[in-house]
Amino acid sequence: MLLQLSYSNGGWSLTSPVYGETPKPSVSDPLLTPDRIRAYLIEVAELLPDGSPQCIVVVGGSLLALLGFREATNDVDSIKRLGTSLKDAVAQVADRHGLAPRWLNDSAAGFAPQTFDESACSVELDHPRLRVLGAPLQQVFVMKLFAARALDITDLTAIWSACGFESPEQAADLYHAAYPHLEWDEYLVDEIRAIGERGSGARTIRLGDVDPEL
């Protein structure tokens, strides 16, 4: 079972995940570079029927790859649910290129922040049949803070400066607003401050850094 890297009482520890994990690709599944992500999404779009354009909102490693914070990822996560025709198109592209069956999935939809606003998203692909939006980085930050796996911590460090938070306290306030069902974490500001301090020396995550288990 995957373990979650969490911060409490001034230090990091490994605990059980706070939510169910998407089945992970095997080590033989090809990594998705930004160019591959765009190409495969266009192929998906071209397989969709005319007259009913669809939309996904990408988050996580795929969005960070598209924005230049990573060189690659294992899958494309959407916080907007995929319809049947979209899932069928995803499966066809997977068969065509030997990808994981759920290389594009909506498993993250259940963990969308309550602060998420689709109108604030960036447009990453504007195809007549498929619009691909990118979630605002501040929303991605709180989602990754919620997941808190090892690679999420690395991603948080990489994107901190680009998120535009005025302070660790502001980021913590957004986190608690995004997930109001969680108990108040008195150590969260210190955790975020540590991420921000490491963020000044952040670099793009290279291909060899991507762990297929994360």
What are these regions (language model features)?
Residues 2-214:
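Compositionally biased terminal segments of proteins
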